[in-house]
Amino acid sequence: MKEYINITCEDNRALMARYPDGYFELAIVDPPYGIGVTRMTLGNGKRKINRGGLEWDNSTPCQGYWNELFRVSKNQIIWGANYMTNFLPPSMGWIYWDKGTGLNDFSDGELAYTSFNRALRSYKVSWVGANANNGTPRIHPTEKPVALYKWLLKNYAKQGDKILDTHFGSGSIAIAVDSMNKVEGMNLTLTGCELDPDYYADAMKRIKAKTAQRSLFQ
């Protein structure tokens, strides 16, 4: 693993407890939405990936998680925050990810809360069906494209920022950080964790394969 990427398999509150107030310049997180995505399908009749029968998306994170997240990070980008607004302060700087789904049964996009005092921004990158990831099957139910994370880093992170991800999932953010460091010279560091050991193992395998490639422009 790259020296600027540090990912552990543990509970996110245990991870955050080790860091002082305001240690991370930016947290980019994708916590459970509390809507049972593990029971949904990918549009082809197949169930979304759910390891070991764990219904991890039955509820949103507790108040203790949010207390720690806002303690250790100066700014936050939170996917699915429209399901957890009761935990969040008001903000004008939301993000809309346009998935380019067209006329089908999938959601047109997803929302992310940000703590930045900016106008709402939208970004479009197609993400339709089980094989949206450049023809590669997804390894996590809420996996997001690397291109989306690269856009977030380019527009919301600053050079040398310390980034936190408390729900690592498929590891797309790590591939994006590696690309932005190599191509844009951003000198970012990423600290993250994933609770599920199977998702963690799959993400580590994916990151090692992707970051070893000479070109990361996908």
What are these regions (language model features)?
Residues 1-154, 158-164, 173-218:
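Class I S-adenosyl-L-methionine-dependent methyltransferase catalytic core
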Residues 169:
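Conserved glycine-rich SAM-binding loop
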